[in-house]
């Protein structure tokens, strides 16, 4: 039954359904090629033949070829490779929300400290991932960078232009260069509009639509994201979740932006569909030279697609570095706790490894702890952690970390 979507299908798969057979200790699979593939390690989300092949003419590669491709240059750009240049710079970004009391006048009685002094750079053709627990300020950071929320203080520069001081009129041409892909493909598309009109809407808003070229551009955008242009007159409810997200990506690409801000673009999709969207994003980045600011809580997605990773806790970045730095050499206790919750695809190692269980609840952003914000849940906390907020700086561990007692601990160990 999986044959129509399988990259390794061959003639026998058409005529005979495979039986569920043992391929290892406590491991069974219903596949005619299980014996060939049992020793080929394929990571989740790795690009496969199915992503690039022409199904009409191509033949499936032999498992040995597939293994060689996997063990070779599977990703287009190694983690930590210098990018082409800085396209966006965020410095000491702060966003506080007023808390108002009850009554008729509703005086302000406090502030919610959603984002507090966040700084990072985004380079051309780079993917920067923001990770952290729900409520840590990831989405608020993205909305403030996009100027959908007015920053309390701080700077957001895009190609040497300061965005926080621009008027709505001046921001209009700049918004064409920074587009957004939303989390929920069911809520981000107007159910009353055909998907072709949804994709064309940015072109019409920014006066870039022409009767002659417009339909061709929309058709090309559909092909670019793997959709059939003949379906552009259908409505969103006629598409699956993955197809709707592809429509959202096509809409974001309509104005030929340089930066895509993506707020958990695959979290609402099934795992099998997530892989296709992630591979599509990588292909588009390589083809168009895009820069991504990716917000996600799925650490496996972040590890696959991101060049650099920033870990947020209660409105602050506590650790930032290349993908390999953060995943292989985590330094901040909070990063180590997050990574310890990631399942390891090895039953023996998974049973032997120790989880880092955090005690207590996440403090309220209305009244954050003094000093280090993580100290109320940290097993290393000492007096200095209560008195002094650690700066995000390189402390001899190879990448910046905001901790008074940084220590590299390999959490994701495999055999």
What are these regions (language model features)?
Residues 1-87, 100-106, 322-415:
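Charged, flexible cofactor/metal-binding loops and thiol motifs
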Residues 146:
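Helix-to-loop junction immediately C-terminal to a conserved catalytic motif
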Residues 154-162, 174:
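Conserved ABC transporter NBD signature motif
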Residues 162, 213-230, 339-340:
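Conserved ABC ATPase "signature" region
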Residues 235-239, 243:
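Conserved ABC ATPase signature
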């Amino acid at each position: 039954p999986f044959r129509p979507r399988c990259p390794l299908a061959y003639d026998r798969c058409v005529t005979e359904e495979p039986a569920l057979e043992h391929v290892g200790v406590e491991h069974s699979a219903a596949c005619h090629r299980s014996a060939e593939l049992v020793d080929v390690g394929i990571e989740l989300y790795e690009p496969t033949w199915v992503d690039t092949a022409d199904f009409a003419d191509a033949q499936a590669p032999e498992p040995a070829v597939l293994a060689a491709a996997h063990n070779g240059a599977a990703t287009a750009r190694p983690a930590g490779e210098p990018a082409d240049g800085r396209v966006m710079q965020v410095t000491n970004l702060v966003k506080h929300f007023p808390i108002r009391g009850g009554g008729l006048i509703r005086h302000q009685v406090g502030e919610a400290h959603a984002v507090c002094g966040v700084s990072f750079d985004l380079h051309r053709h780079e993917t920067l991932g923001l990770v952290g627990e729900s409520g840590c300020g990831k989405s608020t950071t993205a909305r403030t960078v996009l100027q959908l929320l007015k920053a309390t203080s701080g700077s957001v520069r895009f190609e040497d232009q300061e965005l926080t001081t621009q008027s709505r009129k001046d921001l209009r041409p700049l918004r064409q260069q920074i587009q957004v892909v939303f989390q929920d493909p069911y809520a981000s598309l107007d159910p009353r509009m055909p998907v072709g009109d949804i994709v064309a809407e940015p072109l019409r808003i920014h006066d870039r639509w022409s009767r002659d070229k417009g339909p061709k551009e929309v058709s090309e955008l559909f092909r670019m994201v793997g959709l059939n242009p003949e379906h552009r007159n259908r409505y969103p409810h006629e598409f699956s979740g993955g197809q709707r997200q592809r429509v959202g990506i096509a809409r974001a690409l309509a104005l030929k932006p340089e930066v895509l801000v993506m707020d958990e673009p695959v979290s609402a999709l099934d795992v099998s569909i997530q892989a296709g969207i992630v591979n599509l994003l990588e292909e588009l980045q390589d083809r168009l030279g895009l820069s991504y600011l990716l917000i996600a809580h799925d650490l496996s997605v972040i590890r696959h697609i991101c060049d650099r990773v920033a870990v947020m806790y209660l409105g602050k970045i506590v650790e930032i570095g290349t993908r390999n730095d953060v995943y292989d050499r985590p330094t901040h206790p909070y990063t180590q706790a997050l990574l310890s919750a990631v399942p390891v695809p090895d039953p023996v190692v998974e049973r032997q490894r120790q989880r880092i269980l955090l005690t207590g609840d996440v403090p309220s952003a209305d009244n954050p702890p003094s000093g280090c914000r993580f100290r109320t849940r940290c097993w290393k906390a000492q007096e200095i952690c209560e008195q002094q907020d650690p700066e995000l700086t390189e402390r001899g561990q190879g990448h910046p970390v905001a901790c008074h007692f940084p220590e590299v601990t390999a959490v994701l160990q495999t055999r």
